[in-house]
Curated annotation (Swiss-Prot):
One of its GO terms (molecular function) is zinc ion binding. This is Transcriptional repressor NrdR. InterPro entries: ATP-cone_dom, NrdR-like_N, RNR_NrdR-like. Signal peptide: none annotated.
Length: 153
């Protein structure tokens, strides 16, 4: 690892420990040339396969941005969006795969979003599942009502 201060290629790891609930490793490093210390963080790169077949690195911020659009005008806080993004990322990373499809990410978002705000869930699901008619909305609303009745009764 290159020293960020003097650009020396030869640095030493002083300490390593798990970070971010085991999804990353923080390393404390020392540079023998300039004797300065710095911290690095290593994470496994998770790739997303898009519908077009292209791949790109996973981005929690893209998930939050997509859900934020569905939540426009709804009483959903930024903290709640951040927590949803974290839950989705943790769920996907817990599968232990190096590559995930954008479709799988969408499916993973639906559950936590339904718990967060049902209207935002309907908005997101209508785009994600390509609702084409009023009947699609009615069917989804009926499922939401049935779930609510089952959990209350």
């Amino acid at each position: 690892m290159r020293c960020p201060f003097c650009h020396n290629q030869d640095t030493r790891v002083i300490d390593s420990r798990a970070a971010e609930e085991g999804t990353a490793i923080r390393r404390r490093r020392s540079c023998p040339a300039c004797e300065r210390r710095f911290t690095t963080q290593e994470t496994v790169l998770l790739m997303v396969t898009k519908r077009s077949g292209a791949t790109e690195p996973f981005s929690r911020s893209k998930i939050i941005a997509g859900v934020r659009r569905a939540c426009q005008g709804r009483p959903v806080t930024e903290d709640a969006l951040a927590l949803l993004g974290q839950r989705v990322e943790e769920e996907i990373r817990s599968r232990g795969v190096a590559e995930v499809s954008s479709h799988e990410i969408g499916l993973t978002i639906l559950g936590p979003l339904r718990d967060l705000d049902e209207v935002a869930y309907l908005r997101f699901a209508s785009v994600y599942r390509s609702f084409e008619s009023l009947e699609d909305f009615e069917r989804e609303i009926a499922e939401l009502r049935a779930e609510r009745t089952a959990t209350q009764g």
